[in-house]
Amino acid sequence: MTSIIYSPKDIFEQEFKTSMRGFDKKEVDEFLDNVIKDYENFNAQIEALKAENEALKKAKFQARNTVSATVQQPVPQPTRVAQSATNFDILKRISKLEKEVFGKQIIE
């Protein structure tokens, strides 16, 4: 983007040289031409930012919909067979440990 020539302070503090019939017309015209260029640059920047803002809003909306769709899908639960197999293995281990512990106590 083009750089900005005048700040608001520069415009406020601008003083023109006077000639025989008032201000120097050429100097005033150059200054106003530069002010117009600045306004055109500002308008272009504003339009670009508006377009970017709209694109970001759309992306946010799409991301929000994607997340909500993902959250609504049911999480697959472990199958009951796998759970019962795990429980069965745990019971077998407990049974072996009890035999080891209580079996030794009976012998003593």
Curated annotation (Swiss-Prot):
| Keyword Cell division tagged | yes
An annotated GO BP:
cell division
Localisation per UniProt entry: Cytoplasm
What start and end residues bound the annotated signal peptide? none
Name the GO cellular-component terms: cytoplasm
- Keywords on record: Cell cycle, Cell division, Cell shape, Coiled coil, Cytoplasm
Coiled-coil region(s): 32-69
* Major location category of this protein: cytoplasm
**Subunit relationships:** Forms polymers through the coiled coil domains. Interacts with PBP1, MreC and EzrA.
- State the protein's purpose: Divisome component that associates with the complex late in its assembly, after the Z-ring is formed, and is dependent on DivIC and PBP2B for its recruitment to the divisome. Together with EzrA, is a key component of the system that regulates PBP1 localization during cell cycle progression. Its main role could be the removal of PBP1 from the cell pole after pole maturation is completed. Also contributes to the recruitment of PBP1 to the division complex. Not essential for septum formation.
Q: Which family does it belong to?
A: Belongs to the GpsB family.
Name of the protein in question: Cell cycle protein GpsB
Which species expresses this protein natively?
Streptococcus pyogenes serotype M1
Q: Which gene encodes it?
A: gpsB
